[in-house]
Amino acid sequence: MTPEQAAALDSGDMLRVGVFVTDDMRFIEETARAARLDRIQLHGDQSMTCADRLSRTLGAERLIRVLWPERYPDLAALEETMNRHAASTGMFLLDAGMSGGGSGKRIGSERLRGLNAPRPWLLAGGLTPENVKETVAACVPGGVDFNSGLESEPGRKDPSRMRAALPALRG
């Protein structure tokens, strides 16, 4: 989808979120403006310099910084990284694995129990209508990010699974 196609979509109550794995600040800024993105998800190993500049030009409240808890030896190390990034992001997304996303791999949610995050955070990683309530109860995130758990095949969302997700979360 081009930025222009994204901008033409009527977002209604939904937020437009662009997911970026690049460290190219100009590309991210131009795409965010052209697509009229509400949020910018930094889903790569963007530098602190990149995140700081984007927070100044686009607004820290619009940035979602992705971190992979499995990269850290313990909760304290994850919290330390979150604290370093807190000034340049409005929210964190904690994903399973060591990088990337959409693998269907589940995050060890019990590992996040007691997390003292400096900003709101979302949980991602292998969430499905069948496991979301239990997973959320284990670590109490501010929200969830469904991806591959709602697909009938890679890259194709299943409407029935999408309809089942919210009621499953609410229990």
Spans of features found by a protein language model:
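Long, hydrophilic "mature protein body" segments
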Residues: 15, 25-27, 39-42, 134-139, ...
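Glycine-rich phosphate-binding active-site loops on the catalytic face of alpha/beta enzymes
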Residues: 41-47, 96-102, 139-162
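Conserved anion-binding
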Residues: 8-123, 131
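A C-terminal functional module that forms or caps the active site or interfaces directly
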Residues: 123-138, 151
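Residue-level signal for alpha-helix termini/capping positions
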Residues: 33, 59, 137-140, 170
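N-terminal polybasic phosphate/anion-binding patch
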Residues: 1
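C-terminal helical cap(s) of enzyme catalytic domains, especially alpha/beta-barrels
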Residues: 4-10, 52-54, 136, 147-171
